[in-house]
Amino acid sequence: MTAKPAAAAARATVYGYPRQGPHRELKKAIEGYWKGRVDADALRETAAELRRGTWQQLAEAGVHEVPTGDFSYYDHVLDTSVMVGAVPERHRASVEADALDGYFAMARGTQDVAPLEMTKWFDTNYHYLVPELGPDTVFSADSAKQVAEFREALALGWTPRPVLVGPLTYLLLAKAAPGVAADFEPLTLLDRLLPVYAEILADLRAAGATWVQLDEPALVQDRTPAELNAAARAYRELGGRADRPQLLVASYFGRLGEALAVLAKAPVDGLALDFTESGAGNLDDLAAAGGLPGKRLVAGVVNGRNIWINDYAKSLATLGTLLGLADRVDVSASCSLLHVPLDADAERGIDPETARWLAFAKQKTEEIVVLARGLGSGTDAIASELAANRADLASRTGAALTRDPAVRARTAAVTEADGRRSQPYAERSAAQRAGLGLPLLPTTTIGSFPQTTELRTARAELRAGRIDEAEYEERVKDEIREVLSFQEKAGIDVLVHGEPERNDMVQYFAEQLDGYLATQHGWVQSYGTRYVRPPVLAGDISRPEPMTVRWTTYAQSLTARPVKGMLTGPVTMLAWSFVRDDQPLGDTARQVALALRDEVNDLEANGTSVIQVDEPALRETLPLRAAEHAAYLEWATESFRIATSGVRPDTQIHTHMCYAEFGDIVQAIDDLDADVISLEAARSHMQVARELAAHGYPREAGPGVYDIHSPRIPGAEEAAALLRKGLEAIPAERLWVNPDCGLKTRGWPETRASLENLVAAARQIRAELPTGAA
């Protein structure tokens, strides 16, 4: 049957686009600027060229409105803090002296000034800089960046739509500034902030903007009546002004829920909603609310967070249902395309049959345009695209890669006992203390050490065939010896081999597991200039052979001190990959857990007495709505226990988490039943230690005392001060001393100095303890 065309031709648009450039030009330019090799003018020109390229690509693909203002040197939330004048007092002088250097100082810190805290952007793998606010915060409008980028696109002949982080989301993501009472609520500043937003909107209208997008993803989370009332008040005030452009309020990452009725009644001109699986319920809620009469609806039907092709027939059915629920219906992705790589056509190493299933930002844009044409002109207008899409979907469904009978049989045979250690923690702990013989406040690191130029050169030479595998392995062994030697001299108690053989903590394992695919150019932004290439989990997962045993046992042969085995946990293997969407995540996690269980058991059998299974993604993958937490945490914690419960009681299991607020998952952390957990804590001033104590967490913990996301070197007294805070919450016999995270992105000089200071701090605090331990 042929779909009828929409009353008004649907248009294609996107909320945002990857920033880095086809060859990560932005990363290279910014890092060149930091090193003094690129001047500010050259950096700005590179940025302008990348913006122009993005807008041209979008417009040529058929996108009606191109987003502006979503481009950022580091982070769009940090850009918003600058836009509204919320610069922390400690950074104000540097920003006033040089706006660009001051901006980067807020993100990275300096030797003497700490940066803003960094955490995950909702449940994604992107990180934002947390605004610091207090009762004395004075906002002021600075629309220069937004207006300039709008004018850039306008001058090139495109139709720009500026994108701003909305005022509700900005305040709900903020936290109390240092020195402000921890219970301060940034949302109390809304009436102060709204006039600043109104001024910025007026500036954009004066520059020629007809539509402005205000992103409010915070409204898809559980919100209190007071927060919903604040949303109503905010958009009543902003929407009621005569000097504003038309306002498109965008929600994404889930169901808008109670906030939908609030925004539907507000005097705004359009809403953008997520109609993919993550936004299940938005369609029914919209119909129940009576639709959006007189308003524009932007329907996010293409998944902006995963890399699988769209099901055109399914999306067109959703879009057809939406017709009549709004004055006009346009088509987009479910969120900004920031979260996917740029172009699947650049991938030459993936089997052509499998490549048919992939859609990166460029392909998703093309999908959006096709769907808009089908909605606006009828399905006959896209008949060839529909036929090709059906064939591609069928190819994936029938592929051998996606079904391994042996994996499915083993997964089905898992019992509750497979996820339970043979002894309770109290008994295990005694055996581990006796076996390891560690001092109070034992020191360790999280796993990785700096990835040197020599290491990267060796990998490149191996790939190019200029050295053979044997030569490469000798270079890796040289690096392991150097890392171990340094740790022993520094006085670290539990060592790591430094992971010189690993390119990435997920990709390294994915390349050795059946069922995963690797990309060559699938880069996405994690934070700032840190880009990662998430592997593609396309099929059933199994481990053909041991992955880490030879490197860990080699390292252990060089020292009498314990060397940790280092693995990435099942939840993180999923969260930091692009995961198949054709079966429940819990089923996929169990497959990964069983593969890791084999690796854990092999490490133990080869003499490894401390094994760390990192789960930094446990919190970030937590669903945004509380009603969905229990089901997620059940399979997430079970998968960790399946991976780690096959070892003897005297084998110490560690885990690690970072970048997140942990207060609402402390019970889940407890349920992991790990013997030791290390967590990011330096920037949050040991908040997580207090959260663990409030819960009554009974095991050992290492809240980080060294912020590795900044190049600054914390002094021994600074680390000691954090340890004293930690001891207020965690008893000395259960407190570990460690950095926040791995050291891969740091340089050797700062790493050496920082770890030496960390060990000095541990020794100082041991001496201060009543036992006088040294």
Swiss-Prot record:
**Binding-site list for Zn(2+):** H656, C658, E680, C741
Kindly state which reaction or reactions the protein catalyses: 5-methyltetrahydropteroyltri-L-glutamate + L-homocysteine = tetrahydropteroyltri-L-glutamate + L-methionine
Q: Which EC numbers does the record give?
A: 2.1.1.14
Q: Which UniProt keywords apply?
A: Amino-acid biosynthesis, Metal-binding, Methionine biosynthesis, Methyltransferase, Repeat, Transferase, Zinc
Enzyme superclass (EC): transferase
Tell me one Pfam family matched here.
Meth_synt_1
Q: Which cofactor does it need?
A: Zn(2+)
Which GO biological process annotations does it have? Answer: methionine biosynthetic process; methylation
Binding sites annotated in the UniProt record for 5-methyltetrahydropteroyltri-L-glutamate:
R24, E25, L26, K27, K120, W576, E620
- Tell me its family: Belongs to the vitamin-B12 independent methionine synthase family.
Q: Which NCBIfam families match?
A: met_syn_B12ind, PRK05222.1
Name the job this protein performs: Catalyzes the transfer of a methyl group from 5-methyltetrahydrofolate to homocysteine resulting in methionine formation.
Q: What is this protein called?
A: 5-methyltetrahydropteroyltriglutamate--homocysteine methyltransferase
State the organism of origin.
Answer: Streptomyces griseus subsp. griseus (strain JCM 4626 / CBS 651.72 / NBRC 13350 / KCC S-0626 / ISP 5235)
